[in-house]
């Protein structure tokens, strides 16, 4: 049945992340799919971030994103973007729901901070004004 599922970026699933080691999240818990939909279709794995319902701890950590409500979550949860993981699709137990577009933007922001892909808004505005035209070479 899982082979017939269509995994989409922003979907929430219940997954078995295995035995936790040290501070790494494990066990059966909600996860949010971060991988692009092309990869979700073809790959036997999905890139995810685990969620926790222990929302009091390190709530202001920039790699955490608070989900007060999300379609399919029973209680408020925290996305732990510092614990990005690749999960085999056979570890996915069931579909829970989906985060909103606004929530996904917040999760993306936390992931960018975790991976140091963070572009401050000022720099991003400058970059948008200097878009290359089709056929132009970039500087890297």
Q: Where on the chain are the PLM-derived regions?
A:
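Conserved functional hotspots at enzyme active or ligand-binding sites that engage polyanionic ligands
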Residues: 1-140
């Amino acid at each position: 049945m899982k082979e017939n599922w269509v995994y989409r970026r922003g979907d929430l699933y219940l997954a078995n992340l295995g035995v936790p080691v040290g501070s790494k999240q494990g066990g059966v818990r909600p996860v949010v799919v971060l991988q692009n939909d092309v990869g979700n279709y073809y790959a036997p794995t999905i890139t995810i971030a685990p969620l926790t319902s222990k929302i009091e701890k390190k709530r202001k950590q920039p790699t955490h994103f608070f989900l007060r409500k999300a379609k399919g979550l029973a209680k408020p949860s925290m996305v732990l973007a510092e614990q990005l993981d690749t999960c085999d699709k056979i570890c996915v137990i069931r579909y829970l729901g989906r985060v909103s577009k606004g929530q996904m933007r917040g999760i993306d922001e936390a992931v960018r901070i975790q991976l140091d892909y963070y572009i401050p808004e000022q720099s991003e505005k400058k970059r948008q004004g200097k878009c290359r035209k089709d056929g132009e070479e970039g500087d890297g």
